[in-house]
């Protein structure tokens, strides 16, 4: 089980998220290479709303199937891992009087040299976190990767 150097899923999702200037070109290239891609934005004082926004966008864009449990479950774990980075391990937002404004990228595909390894999913989050007062936030980032 060897990672394919050009198919590192976490790296690709982070680069997609941070490269806003050439986003559409990058999405086309990723899709041409067999990746399923979803991009979006979410802002909330509730972590469950962040999770729901990412799941809804992923289903609408075809990154995961609407029916079934396994794909949603994998996305959930990748999203929670990314949120741990954003919130520095404390998954609370509104109850600690903080809010997030995030862009997200979800990428699905096989990052390994062997097709037998199957698909994985990566969620990258970038934006701001802080008190719900304009100007009192700071940058934050998180990434999560899970097998499907």
Curated annotation (Swiss-Prot):
Q: Does the keyword Cell wall biogenesis/degradation apply?
A: no
Q: Which GO terms describe its biological process?
A: L-histidine metabolic process; positive regulation of gene expression
Consequence the record notes for mutating residue 10 to A: Decrease in binding affinity for mRNA
Q: Please give the superkingdom of this protein's source.
A: Bacteria
Reported impact of residue 26 to A: Decrease in binding affinity for mRNA
GO MF annotations in UniProt: mRNA binding
Q: Which InterPro entries match?
A: Regulatory_HutP (IPR015111), Regulatory_HutP_bacillales (IPR023552), Regulatory_HutP_sf (IPR036482)
Report keywords, A-Z.
Activator, Histidine metabolism, RNA-binding, Transcription, Transcription regulation
Among the Pfam families in the record, one is: HutP
User: What happens after mutating residue 18 to A?
Assistant: Great decrease in binding affinity for mRNA
UniProt key word Secreted: no
**Self-association state and partner proteins as the record states:** Homohexamer.
The record describes the protein's role as:
Antiterminator that binds to cis-acting regulatory sequences on the mRNA in the presence of histidine, thereby suppressing transcription termination and activating the hut operon for histidine utilization.
Q: Which NCBIfam families match?
A: PRK03065.1
Protein name (Swiss-Prot/TrEMBL):
Hut operon positive regulatory protein
* Organism expressing this protein natively: Bacillus subtilis (strain 168)
């Amino acid at each position: 089980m060897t990672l394919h150097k050009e198919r590192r899923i976490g790296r690709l999702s982070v680069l997609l998220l941070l490269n806003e200037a050439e986003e559409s070109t990058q999405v086309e290239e990723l899709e041409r290479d067999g990746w399923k891609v979803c991009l979006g934005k979410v802002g909330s004082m509730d972590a469950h709303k962040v999770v729901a926004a990412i799941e809804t966008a992923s289903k609408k864009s075809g990154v995961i199937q609407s029916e079934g449990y396994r794909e949603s479950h994998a996305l959930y774990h990748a999203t929670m891992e990314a949120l741990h980075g954003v919130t520095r391990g404390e998954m609370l937002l509104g109850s600690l009087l903080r809010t997030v404004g995030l862009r997200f990228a979800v990428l699905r595909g096989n990052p390994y040299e062997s097709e037998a390894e199957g698909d994985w999913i990566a969620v990258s989050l970038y934006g701001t976190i802080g008190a719900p007062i304009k100007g009192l936030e700071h940058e934050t980032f998180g990434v999560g990767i899970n097998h499907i």
